[in-house]
């Protein structure tokens, strides 16, 4: 099982998301919705650290097993809004925010920070295809530097990996990473 993490400095934490025109008012949760829908691994989970207020940072946890009902950006927004408002949802929310993320990250290794200035992906193929990695990225903005440093100190660092010379959106990066990992899943499925 793998974990995909989006750190959103602007993601709204209270669930007050309009049904239409939600990109701006939601603090760009649409970026997280597209990242969720881009992940191809069936046993993965997406965790989004929302830091845009009005409540303190919160961790939205969205298992890919919900994809049967979450098939679009809009349906992601509906589920996220329900979870953030404490209503019944296939997503969950942890109000401990940063500490909840650190605790979740401790269960996965290696912890890979997907960064433009990271090492070449081809040099880290073994880590990328390990059985329980975490892939961490920013949303439409880079994660706050102080937060990354705090997490690195508490977790013993991150492996920084770049997927190439282009500046890509989070959903494109997650699509690429999960597509590269798919042959590994196909092989393990065939042997069972």
From Swiss-Prot:
Major location (coarse): cytoplasm
GO molecular function, one term: tRNA methyltransferase activity
Subunit architecture: Homodimer.
Keyword Hydrolase in record: no
Family to which this protein belongs: Belongs to the methyltransferase superfamily. TrmY family.
Function: Specifically catalyzes the N1-methylation of pseudouridine at position 54 (Psi54) in tRNAs.
Annotated residues for binding of S-adenosyl-L-methionine: 114, 138
The protein's name in its UniProt record: tRNA (pseudouridine(54)-N(1))-methyltransferase
Keywords noted in UniProt: Cytoplasm, Methyltransferase, S-adenosyl-L-methionine, Transferase, tRNA processing
GO cellular component, one term: cytoplasm
Annotated catalysed reactions: pseudouridine(54) in tRNA + S-adenosyl-L-methionine = N(1)-methylpseudouridine(54) in tRNA + S-adenosyl-L-homocysteine + H(+)
EC number(s) reported in the record: 2.1.1.257
InterPro entries linked: Alpha/beta_knot_MTases, TrmY, tRNA_m1G_MTases_N
Subcellular location: Cytoplasm
Gene Ontology terms: biological process: tRNA methylation
């Amino acid at each position: 099982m793998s974990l995909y993490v989006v750190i959103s400095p602007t993601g709204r934490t209270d669930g007050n998301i309009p049904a239409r025109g939600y990109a701006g008012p939601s603090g760009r949760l649409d970026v997280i919705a597209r990242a969720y829908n881009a992940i191809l691994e069936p046993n993965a989970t997406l965790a989004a650290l929302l830091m845009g207020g009005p409540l303190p940072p919160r961790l939205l946890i969205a298992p890919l097993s919900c994809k049967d009902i979450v098939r679009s950006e809009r349906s992601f927004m509906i589920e996220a809004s329900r979870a953030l408002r404490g209503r019944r949802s296939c997503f969950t929310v942890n109000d401990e925010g940063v500490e909840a993320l650190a605790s979740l990250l401790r269960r996965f290794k290696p912890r890979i920070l997907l960064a433009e200035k990271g090492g070449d992906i081809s040099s880290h193929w073994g880590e990328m295809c390990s059985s329980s990695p975490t892939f961490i990225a920013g949303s439409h903005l880079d994660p706050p530097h102080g937060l990354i440093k705090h997490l690195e100190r508490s977790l013993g660092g991150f492996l920084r990996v770049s997927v190439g010379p282009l500046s890509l959106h989070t959903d494109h990066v997650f699509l690429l990473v999960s597509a590269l990992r798919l042959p590994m899943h196909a092989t393990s499925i065939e042997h069972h």
